Regions:
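Transmembrane beta-barrel domains of Gram-negative outer membranes and organellar outer membranes
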Residues: 28-197, 205-207, 236-240, 250-252, ...
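A generic signature of intrinsically disordered, low-complexity regions enriched in glycine/proline
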Residues: 6, 11, 249-250, 264
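Cleavable N-terminal export/targeting peptides
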Residues: 1-46
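Short glycine/proline-enriched turn or capping motifs at secondary-structure junctions
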Residues: 286-296
């Protein structure tokens, strides 16, 4: 009962914050095309979109950028919803993020992974769902990916994502050691304005199986492993960007092989207060189903 109440409270808090963000962005738009004083001082699209764990970045991997459009004397925030449809599964993901003075980022996301008919094949029941909460934090150490155009030094940030899965018994049955864990990462991001090109590299230290949906650690490995993640984005205009991502994955479970992830995406930001991202993602093997590919769609609102 307590857990259900906590989950409802968390969800309600997220809805309230999302509603506040929508109200603030609407108010900002009502004020005309000029940027309101004290908010949204960054260039369009330089705050990234929402990664599936809630951090600012690409869809699959966090970037060193601090989310939102707040500069070093401003606060920014985003709320997002993402849907990923593969052949045999789907993922619903929603969350909120606050960026403080272009230095610190705090985020929360809730992921719901629906096994559809595969759940029935596994004896769990059709539509069996894993729910995972992700609490994240990121700190910019040095560099400015946008403003330091006279230097090759990238913006570098460190971050963490604490993840808690609600299906403890199930993930342990498939071989995971635990249903909660923490990822740590370091990201380096550089925007080359004259070439309209953004590059990002992330090194993640993780024990997560399928980003934590299948728990943490396993019969093959139960120690932190360093996994590489990378993104490249090309700015077609001030409102449009295209790009691709790669995310290396660990392989901890003997009965559930795991493959690296890839995607190709297009992002559209008509204003600083809303962005839409569409991607085609290749997720490889997930439990007993190979070649999981599908569409990724995400909407983000904020300032």
């Amino acid at each position: 009962m307590y857990k259900h109440r906590m989950n409802r409270a968390i969800a309600l808090g997220g809805l309230v914050l999302a509603g506040a963000l929508v109200s603030l962005t609407a108010a900002a738009d009502d004020g005309g095309s000029s940027t309101p004083a004290g908010v949204s001082g960054k260039l369009l699209l330089t705050g990234g979109v929402s990664e599936i764990g809630g951090a600012a970045g690409g869809g699959l991997t966090p970037w060193a950028l601090i989310g939102g459009y707040g500069t070093n004397d401003q606060i920014g925030a985003n709320a997002f919803y993402t849907r990923v449809n593969a052949q045999d599964y789907h993922l619903d993901d929603a969350g909120v993020m606050v960026g403080l003075y272009d230095r610190v980022e705090i985020s929360f996301a809730q992921q719901r992974f629906d096994t559809e008919k595969v759940g029935g094949l596994l004896g769990l029941g059709n539509g069996f769902t894993f729910r995972q909460n992700v609490l994240g934090a990121k700190v910019r150490l040095f560099g400015d990916a946008v403003l330091d155009q006279d230097s090759w030094v990238p913006q570098v940030s460190v971050g963490m994502q604490y993840k808690k899965n609600n299906q403890d018994a199930v993930v342990k049955f498939v071989g995971a050691k635990r249903s909660q864990g923490t990822d740590y990462y370091v990201s380096a991001t550089k925007l080359f304005l004259s070439q309209s090109l953004l590059l990002n590299a992330t090194l993640r230290f993780t024990k997560a199986n399928q980003i934590g949906i299948l728990g943490f650690g396993g019969d093959k490995h139960d120690s932190y492993q360093a996994e590489f993640e990378g993104s490249v984005a090309y700015l077609l205009s001030r409102n449009w960007a295209i790009g691709a991502e790669y995310r290396q994955k660990p392989n901890n479970l003997g009965i559930a092989k795991e493959n690296d992830w890839y995607d190709a995406f297009v992002a559209w930001a008509p204003t600083k207060h809303v962005s839409l991202t569409l991607a085609y993602a290749n997720l490889g093997n997930i439990v007993i189903k190979d070649n999981q590919r599908g569409l990724y769609a995400s909407v983000q609102v904020g300032f």
